[in-house]
Swiss-Prot record:
The modification Phosphotyrosine is found at residue 210. It comes from the Eukaryota. The modification Phosphoserine is found at residue 590. GO terms for biological process: regulation of small GTPase mediated signal transduction; vesicle-mediated transport to the plasma membrane. Its main location: cytoplasm. Phosphatidylinositol 3,4,5-trisphosphate-dependent guanine nucleotide exchange factor (GEF) which plays a role in the activation of Rho GTPases RAC1, RhoA and CDC42. Can regulate cell morphology in cooperation with activated RAC1. Involved in immune homeostasis by ensuring proper trafficking and availability of T-cell regulator CTLA-4 at T-cell surface. Plays a role in Th2 (T helper cells) development and/or activation, perhaps by interfering with ZAP70 signaling. The modification N6-acetyllysine is found at residue 225. This is Differentially expressed in FDCP 6 homolog. Tyrosine-phosphorylated by tyrosine-protein kinase LCK in response to T-cell activation. It is linked to Immunodeficiency 87 and autoimmunity: An autosomal recessive disorder with onset in infancy or early childhood. It is characterized by increased susceptibility to infections, often Epstein-Barr virus, as well as lymphadenopathy or autoimmune manifestations, predominantly hemolytic anemia. The disorder results primarily from defects in T-cell function. The PH domain is essential for phosphatidylinositol 3,4,5-trisphosphate binding. GO terms for molecular function: guanyl-nucleotide exchange factor activity.
Length: 631
């Protein structure tokens, strides 16, 4: 039941956010989306087809016949299982829907709350609000939450300032008896109660209070824990909840290292200092004993007291400390309210008794005065009554005489009335006979009108059938006209598409023709290169033949006497120079044979005195015959 009330508070905000006109009604399409999101976030299995059936546009579904609240109870809240979903995700869904419409943070960035802080304060408001709609938080709970946030920041506010602030808010909320959530968030955003506090400090304090009240974190902090296998000490971040003691690798709580379940049979004991550790204590469960060490004696005392409180809650069968405290505060407020109401009722009763006493005294004085006036009036009335009696007696005597005369005239008039009555009876008899004849004529006329009405109804039905057939013919004609127009449009689109494809085909043909021309030019270039290559090969062969002829040794001739005049121009080094030039030519010829480039052809032409044939390549035999190096 408590979980259902908490879920209903968040769903109420989502529903009112969808109710734009403030009429208490929301469209079925929006309710269908809301229900689907609730099914998803609450991990309730559902059939999408059945969901569509429930929110049909007709008036046969359960939502149309019963309203959304019975549907919400029957199909959603009755199927919720505690622990099967993450309540924070559910609250985030409802906050997202209501914050888009109702929550407006300062666009200049002067607000004290971030969106996450506003969401957590919204959750805290729902937790501490009354179980009445629209949801409000009474000033006592506002004071309690403010003190919690300020104590988390290690700040203290004077009692006078707090009472002044709450008095201002009470004046704002005096019509409703408390603050709405948007007034509550505006109180934090304005910074009136948080002068000199930074946004980061406030965010950390709100997060700590959120963990304590919503997530039931009784205490958290670093402790040294002794392992069970290696028996070494490691520092861990511990979080104490009513049902367990969890420990993590760091305070971000991303890596859970273990969990210590707590029940009514667990206990906590203080241990003496040993192994270099001080302020030690242990938690004994049914299966294992966990040894821990705090930083100082105060921390150890706080941890042991908090763990004992969690064990006490388990023994009493309670799941949340702050839910129990909230219920106790509510009962105390109700007792104070009853005492105050009883006191006010007693004061009101005493005031009414005093007023009643004063009123009776005034009535007594009035009665005495009225009695004196009544005596005086009674005397006057007695004298007036006597005179009136005399006058009345005289008047009665005169009336008696007039009555005797009237009786005589009345008898004569009665005789005339009897004669008139006899005539009236005869007239009534005639009228009854006439009425009977008129009724018979009326029945005949009614029958004729009924026959006429049946004929008219038949004619109307025939006219309606003819109009229906005419409408069908007109609809058929309109469909044929639309079909003709659509066919004409499709024909025009097809013609445009064919024209576009024709243009694309022409462009493709032009590109193909250009490619063919480029290919033809490339083929011509290849053929020219091949001709040049063949010509170069022929020239190389021709040059090799000439070089082979030049390489034959010159046979010695007949010896002749040498004169100084005959060999005056002979210089032996020139022959060696010629041989080296010949080797160089053969080497250039071999390079030209490997790579017939235009530059090598030009070099060979320059060496051969303008001959177009390239230098022949040297053969392996020639390299073996003349291995002398170049100069």
């Amino acid at each position: 039941m408590a979980l259902r009330k908490e879920l209903l508070k968040s769903i109420w905000y989502a529903f009112t956010a969808l109710d734009v006109e403030k009429s208490g009604k929301v469209s079925k399409s929006q309710l269908k989306v809301l229900s689907h999101n609730l099914y998803t976030v609450l991990h309730i299995p559902h059939d999408p087809v059945a969901l569509e059936e429930h929110f049909r546009d007709d008036d046969d579904g359960p939502v149309s016949s019963q309203g959304y609240m019975p549907y919400l109870n029957k199909y959603i809240l009755d199927k919720v299982e505690e622990g099967a979903f993450v309540k924070e995700h559910f609250d985030e869904l409802c906050w997202t829907l209501t914050a888009k419409k109702n929550y407006r943070a300062d666009s200049n960035g002067n607000s004290m709350l971030s969106n996450q802080d506003a969401f957590r304060l919204w959750c805290l408001f729902n937790f501490l609000s009354e179980d009445k709609y629209p949801l409000i938080m009474v000033p006592d709970e506002v004071e309690y939450l403010l003190k919690k946030v300020l104590s988390s920041m290690s700040l203290e506010v004077s009692l006078g300032e707090l009472e002044e602030l709450l008095a201002q808010e009470a004046q704002v909320a005096q019509t409703t008896g408390g603050l709405s959530v948007w007034q509550f968030l505006e109180l934090f955003n304005s910074g009136r109660c948080l002068r000199g506090v930074g946004r980061d400090t406030l965010s950390m304090a709100i997060h700590e209070v959120y963990q304590e009240l919503i997530q039931d974190v009784l205490k958290q902090g670093y402790l040294w824990k002794r392992g069970h296998l290696r028996r070494n000490w490691a520092e861990r971040w511990f979080q104490l909840q009513p049902s367990c003691l969890c420990y993590f690798g760091s305070e971000e709580c991303k890596e859970k290292r273990g969990i210590i379940p707590l029940d009514a049979h667990c206990c906590v004991e203080v241990l003496p200092d040993r192994d270099g550790k001080r302020c030690m204590f242990c938690v004994k469960t049914a299966n294992r004993t966990y040894e821990m060490s705090a930083s100082d004696t105060r921390q150890r005392q706080e941890w042991t007291a908090a763990i004992q409180m969690a064990i006490r809650l388990q023994a009493e069968g309670k799941t949340s400390l702050h839910k129990d405290l909230k219920q106790k505060r509510r009962e105390q407020r109700e007792q104070r309210e009853r005492r105050r109401a009883a006191k006010e009722e007693e004061l009101l009763r005493l005031q009414q008794l005093q007023e009643e006493k004063e009123r009776k005294l005034q009535e007594l004085e009035l009665l005495q005065e009225a009695q004196r006036q009544a005596e005086r009036l009674l005397q006057e009335e007695e004298e007036r009554r006597r005179s009136q009696h005399r006058e009345l007696q005289q008047a009665l005597e005169g009336q008696l005489r007039e009555a005797e005369q009237a009786r005589a005239s009345m008898q004569a008039e009665m005789e005339l009335k009897e004669e008139e009555a006899a005539r009236q009876r005869q007239r009534i008899k005639e009228l009854e006979e006439m009425q009977q004849r008129l009724q018979e004529a009326l029945q005949l006329e009614v029958k004729a009108r009924r026959d006429e009405e049946s004929v008219r109804i038949a004619q109307t039905r025939l006219l309606e059938e003819e109009e229906e057939k005419l409408k069908q013919l007109m609809q058929l004609k309109e469909e044929q006209e639309r079909y003709i127009e659509r066919a004409q449009q499709e024909k025009e689109e097809l013609q445009q598409e064919m024209a576009q494809q024709s243009r694309s085909l022409q462009q493709a043909q032009q590109q193909l023709e250009e490619v063919r021309q480029n290919r033809q030019r490339a083929d011509e270039d290849v053929e020219a290169a091949q001709r040049k290559l063949r010509q170069a090969s022929t020239n190389v062969k021709h040059w090799n033949v000439q070089m082979n002829r030049l390489m034959h040794p010159i046979e010695p001739g007949d010896k002749r006497p040498v004169t100084s005049s005959s060999f005056s121009g002979f210089q032996p080094p020139l022959l060696a120079h010629r041989d080296s030039s010949l080797k160089r030519l053969t080497r250039w010829g071999s390079q030209g044979n490997r790579t017939p480039s235009p530059n090598s052809n030009e070099q060979q032409k320059s060496l051969n005195g303008g001959d177009e044939a390239p230098a022949p390549a040297s053969t392996p035999q020639e390299d073996k015959l003349d291995p002398a190096p170049e100069n």
